[in-house]
């Protein structure tokens, strides 16, 4: 019970009004605080600040990854090259802006119910664009079949201007386009993964996707499903 302790606590609090007691109280308070600061410093040693990534807007430095873009109606939008764009799920305004940008095909890799797929297809086709649906999990790595569908479309439609999206445009989209960079543009797995981070891939939540991309060159070289693409160059 705390009730019997209240008079004692009250008297101790009143003592702090005395200047001498206040100095003594502060001196005792400093000891645990200093110990906490020392313990934190041991557990978190100082490191030099990491270098900031090269900005795509810095004229003094080359653009290392895709170009970030501002597009009304969609977020996390990026231009990888002249025919391949990426980003989040667009709203109605976003689809209109993509059509004005010259996008000819929307590639939706969300795994969603058929009603949502039907509505998006209708909206996209009403704007004169093509709609491609490759449903992929937001938590698991893509299957070989899902990537084969994506690679096959790129190979068979080299003049299409694509916008690839999932929900937020960071995790699933990042994995698909990292695989594209490795296969068609011969990027290293590390560089492809760094571009995933550049477009806000959430490594903490999706370690399996990171490991998948790090191991993708070896998997691509061995899987029979990817045999038709092993001698590919950039589709342009």
Map each language-model feature to its residues:
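Short cysteine clusters
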Residues: 166
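Short, low-complexity interaction segments enriched in Ser/Thr/Pro/Gly
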Residues: 10-12, 48
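Extreme N-terminal basic, low-complexity initiation segments
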Residues: 2-10
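Glycine/aspartate-rich loop-and-adjacent alpha/beta segment that forms the canonical ThDP
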Residues: 172
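Bacterial N-terminal signal peptides
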Residues: 30-40
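Bacterial N-terminal signal peptides that target proteins for export
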Residues: 15-32
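Cys-dependent protein tyrosine phosphatase-like superfamily
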Residues: 38, 42-162, 175-236
């Amino acid at each position: 019970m705390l009730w019997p302790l209240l008079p004692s606590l009250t008297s101790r609090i009143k003592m702090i009004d005395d200047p001498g007691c206040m100095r003594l109280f502060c001196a005792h308070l400093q000891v645990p605080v200093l110990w906490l600061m020392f313990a934190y410093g041991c557990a978190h040693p100082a490191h030099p600040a990491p270098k900031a990534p090269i900005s795509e807007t810095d004229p003094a430095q080359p653009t290392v990854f895709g170009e970030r873009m501002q597009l009304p109606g969609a977020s996390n939008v990026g231009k990888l090259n002249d025919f391949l764009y990426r980003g989040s799920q667009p709203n109605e305004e976003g689809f209109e802006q993509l059509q004005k940008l010259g996008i000819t095909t929307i590639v939706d890799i969300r795994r969603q119910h058929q009603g949502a797929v039907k509505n998006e297809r209708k909206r996209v086709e009403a704007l004169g664009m093509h709609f491609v649906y490759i449903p992929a999990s937001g938590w698991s790595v893509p299957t070989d079949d899902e990537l084969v569908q994506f690679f096959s479309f790129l190979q068979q439609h080299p003049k299409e201007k694509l916008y690839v999206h999932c929900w937020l445009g960071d995790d699933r989209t990042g994995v698909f386009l990292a695989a594209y960079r490795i296969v068609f543009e011969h990027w290293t797995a590390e560089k492809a993964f760094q571009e995933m981070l550049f477009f806000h891939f959430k490594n903490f939540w999706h370690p399996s996707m990171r490991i998948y991309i790090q191991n993708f060159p070896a998997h691509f070289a061995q899987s029979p499903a990817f045999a038709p693409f092993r001698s590919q160059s950039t589709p342009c």
